[in-house]
């Protein structure tokens, strides 16, 4: 009788052991050309100064610039001892900012990689950061688990505004791109929260009380991510297992709903191909037809929750709790090939195994006869 020599096995249920074994087996796959990092990856942003590179934030408290083609770490940003949740670059691209579990926003000089100013003011985890230029001044905007949004002067570190109104923690911040194009004197900031509300405010604000304006309530629970497409429509990803497209011209009314089997962590729109790409807690990256809302293909490779996605040219770059960065091509030929390969694999798995017409004893006798013939 086999007995486990692993002490932790005695404290796990059969289901949890099976899940651990499943993940261990799946972790060996090379789908998406995985780049393995030391710890869980919680955020990703583009590197505007280096094509083919991205910045990622890790649970170990480090941020790094990774070259996608080689997997090389081109720059490492250290200092925090708590997980980093979010990233942003200053408007001039010279400073990297990271929201941290230590309730502050860290910053580094991109070229020297040396830590710079820390921005303080939150009483709980910082969950999201973004940057903008407002009336000629560069500002850092942070959202925290304390439900506050703080606008800082990047140069001085001064807290310019503190916006309140959400009832629970901020999950994401997104600047309306149309507000940047139309009026250089200010911007419009959208915020998503665990209270299921999406709110928006002008920066500089007319009031520090976000609750004075009507929120958008289109989800049943937490909204994790916001994404503006080229038409200015707002895409939302939620813990209610849906992604929704809110039409700007129809007062932000949903005109498309994408149903998922689990929490949806991120969404992006690939304009050139007409695809919507989503990241889900069920470990999958999905590609949807934007016009019809139909699921076209599912990229499988991650073996833990997918925490974020980023479009780099015609490639989807995904990150995960499994500590890998993976890449998926959306070029028409590559996407069609991936879809056909996935369908062929599914057909093979569904093919019933033919049962032998022989009894176990007859099969044994046949095997012995074949050995004798040799």
Task: Describe the residue ranges of each PLM region.
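Terminal intrinsically disordered, low-complexity extensions flanking WD-repeat/beta-propeller proteins
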Residues: 1-25, 294-298, 303-315, 319-374
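A short helix->beta-strand "capping" segment at the edge of beta-propeller domains
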Residues: 11-40, 70
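A short beta-strand motif characteristic of beta-propeller blades
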Residues: 30-35, 72-77, 114-119, 158-163, ...
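WD40/WD-repeat beta-propeller blade N-cap
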Residues: 34-41, 77-84, 119-126, 164-170, ...
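Loop/turn segments within WD40 beta-propeller blades
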Residues: 44-51, 70, 88-93, 130-137, ...
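Structural hallmark of WD40 beta-propellers
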Residues: 50-55, 75, 93-97, 106, ...
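Short coil/turn segments within WD40 beta-propeller repeats
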Residues: 60-64, 82, 102-106, 124-127, ...
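Short loop/turn segments that connect beta-strands within beta-propeller blades
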Residues: 68-71, 110-113, 154-157, 203-207, ...
């Amino acid at each position: 009788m086999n007995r486990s020599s692993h002490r932790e096995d005695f404290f796990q249920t059969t289901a949890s052991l099976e899940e651990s074994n499943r993940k261990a087996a799946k972790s060996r796959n090379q789908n998406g050309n995985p780049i393995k990092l030391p710890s869980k990856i919680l955020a990703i942003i583009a590197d505007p100064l280096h094509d083919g590179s991205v910045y990622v934030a890790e649970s170990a408290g480090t941020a790094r610039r990774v070259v996608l083609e080689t997997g090389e770490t081109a720059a490492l940003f250290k200092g925090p001892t708590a997980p980093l949740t979010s990233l942003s670059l200053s408007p001039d691209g010279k400073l990297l900012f990271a929201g941290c579990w230590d309730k502050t926003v860290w910053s580094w000089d991109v070229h020297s990689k040396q830590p710079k100013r820390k921005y303080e003011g939150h009483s709980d985890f910082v969950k999201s950061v973004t940057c903008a230029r407002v009336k000629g001044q560069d500002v850092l905007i942070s959202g925290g688990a304390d439900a506050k949004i703080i606008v800082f002067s990047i140069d001085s570190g001064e807290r310019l505004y503190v916006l309140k109104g959400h009832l629970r923690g901020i999950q994401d911040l997104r600047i309306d791109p149309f507000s940047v194009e139309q009026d250089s004197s200010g911007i419009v900031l959208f915020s998503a929260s665990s209270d299921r509300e999406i709110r928006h405010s002008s920066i500089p604000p007319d009031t520090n009380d976000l609750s004075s304006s009507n929120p958008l309530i289109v989800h049943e629970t937490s909204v994790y991510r916001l994404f503006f497409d080229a038409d200015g429509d707002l895409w939302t990803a939620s813990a209610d297992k849906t992604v929704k497209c809110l039409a700007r011209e129809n007062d932000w009314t949903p005109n498309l709903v994408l149903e998922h089997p689990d929490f949806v962590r991120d969404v992006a729109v690939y304009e050139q191909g007409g695809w919507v790409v989503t990241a889900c807690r069920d470990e999958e990256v999905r590609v949807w037809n934007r016009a019809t809302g139909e699921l076209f293909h599912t990229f499988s490779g991650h073996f833990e929750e997918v925490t974020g996605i980023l479009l780099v040219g015609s490639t989807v770059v995904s990150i995960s709790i499994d500590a890998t960065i993976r890449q998926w091509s959306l070029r028409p030929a590559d996407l069609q090939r991936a879809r056909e390969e996935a369908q062929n694999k599914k057909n093979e798995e569904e093919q019933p195994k033919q049962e032998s017409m022989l009894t176990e004893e007859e099969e044994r006798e046949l095997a012995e006869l074949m050995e004798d013939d040799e």
